[in-house]
């Protein structure tokens, strides 16, 4: 009798096959796509509405936006088909994963069933995200994290890179239903639920397409980001035109959780979203291999980059002073070769605080000591832009803020410096923005860029005006990063970017950050042109669609401080 009872494994349904989409009431949302201003049925918050109202479709003509696929939060909604293929364990022949590929999303997605954990918070994000699954009766429940920022609809309704997704794949004979639940603490008041239906269609031709970017608009200014300013005619049209055309009650087309309930009344509930894992540094310093011979250390202040090879170790930034011994121990887990070169991306102590410790633990190659300091004869060389040395040494006669042994032993004055170390060409590019001594470091063979604090995934960019920083400098630096980076496929991977703080990134993440800074700058500039004072600019909250993602009301760098820095920069 026991042998005849169905086991959970035997009860699982095979989801593999070629599937064609079935369109019902949502057909207009598939082809040609939802109308501008149609946010019906979406539990958008105020930030999500402003984000959608600001969206200008011409942004898709930018080279860095053209090849972006739809993330897995939306790719199943397109007017196309999908292929699901089983991945089998070569020994046991058990299904360990499903591979899902769609002609609309174009991002191959692996859904793992073998019990593997999700990556840590500082790992790179992708369009497909990282998906794990388990069977719950006849439904495959899938949980996806590590998603890039993308779209919930093709009319500007967005989700952030903090979004997560839960799905249930349910097969009934030749029909497949997928229930998708997207939760985004940045742009949604509550999880957004929708279903998509498919029919088995073995004869479907599902193939990958090649996409190359082109210049679609001639004469566009470098770094221009198309968007609608708040209160502009185009933004206001989104707020009124759709509801007016379809004679909908005022506000009903604007989305929001209450509009999805009978009589527009949302039941009271307690949020269970919990703390944000993306803003919490690990207790222990963690090492992550990026690619080539380049690694990233997280947890010692600013991010640290380690290049290791036969010639020794090169370190970019050194973290805070109190963590020097821990940083050195973490480096020794990567390689026991001598530390030869230390590079500072800028002057701040969270990136240069352990200079003295790491330099003393190393030794430069040969006896050549460029610059004025004999320390490089015994210790590792410390390289930085000349402005970093000026800030550390206070040559004007004031007391030096940093000990002599922490100063750069070698500097450069111009736009760049070139090294060749561990069989790899390395470019140091002076790009003032966060401070006047900022440099970007490009490992050309490993295809990894260290951005310093020109780019961070955690906060608004810190503008240190006292040390020569400027908002325009940050924007110029971000555009320079975009010029350097080349994605592998569909604006993903390829050149990886290590931010000054936060998770591993690529070009698409830099583009998202560049767009944000540029849009905020343009909004403040528009208010200044209208004669608004600083207090009035702050009251207009030009950052409110980004505050949930990058803002802060307390701490060393608040939203108010960022807005004031932008205002001061625009007023120059």
Name what the model sees in each region.
Residues 10-272, 368-377, 461:
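PEST-like low-complexity, intrinsically disordered acidic/proline/serine-rich tracts
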Residues 269-277, 364-367, 487-494, 503-572:
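Accessory terminal helices/loops
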Residues 285-334, 440-452:
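Conserved beta-strand hairpin/beta-sheet module of binuclear metal-dependent hydrolase folds
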Residues 289, 312-313, 320-322, 373-519, ...:
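Metallo-beta-lactamase
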Residues 293, 307, 317, 331, ...:
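Divalent metal-coordination and catalytic microenvironments
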Residues 310-314, 322-380:
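Active-site metal-binding motif and surrounding structural segment of the metallo-beta-lactamase
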